[in-house]
């Protein structure tokens, strides 16, 4: 088992597999970011066109006057939510490879433990 850990070919294959996985995942995040950004822009444009077309009839009827305020809020609330999702996926797109690199870099550093392995912790089951 010890020979496998020090085998350079296995390390190269493992690193190559990790690199392909990271590339695939970051590609998905970039795609989702683009999808949400496009959806936000298209939705805002369509809602703005509908608002401009219907505002005259809403102002004429006093009962529909409140719906113009609600529609005006929705014009901005929904697309900004999509923009926030796009920004989140974009940040994830840039941060995932860096996090993976740091995990890979510091994987061999042992964590500091307050007790020796195999030793019972005080207050635990004996």
Swiss-Prot record:
Record keyword Oxidoreductase present: no
An annotated GO cellular component: plasma membrane
Keyword Transmembrane helix appears in the UniProt entry: yes
Keywords: Cell inner membrane, Cell membrane, Conjugation, Membrane, Plasmid, Transmembrane, Transmembrane helix
Cell compartment(s), UniProt: Cell inner membrane
NCBIfam families linked: PRK13743.1
Designated name of the protein: Protein TrbF
Species of provenance: Escherichia coli (strain K12)
Gene: trbF
